[in-house]
């Protein structure tokens, strides 16, 4: 399958999550599979996709500079983090699934009792993460991610190499979803997942609830 158009990170999925954490005193590092420049899905910059909050961060030169000069997964220490968050965008379908360095970082954070989280197609980053004994960290967990019906609604269900919802189920996860484009996030243990671009804020809020209940 070939999408035949540029893709990459869906910007709003970073902004909405980061905004909640910044307001609660967290520092955030930005990491990508190969470090450096992060490709941005041009569709996420369309006027009808950008909220006032999105424009605020997009026009923040310091923020965008950091996002444009990401770290590599092996350049950071897992013990420094309370959470790892995989933002989505169709580009992650190709970039996240088989990246061993991201998987190793995620495993270490998970086994340190840190939160492992994602939104939308970012859930692909969790598909092949295993614990030290080789068990999938999402097998038996309740999760969500970009739904088949949403993929069909944007006309890309037959253009992508696999569907996020199907792959989560194939890993033994219990998949749940809300209505198309509704804010929907679930937490199971310290795995937190959001369904779509509308759900980044909800993922961050569930992380804060988890931290406050510890």
Ranges and model annotations:
Residues 116-117:
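Conserved, well-structured core segments that form or line functional sites
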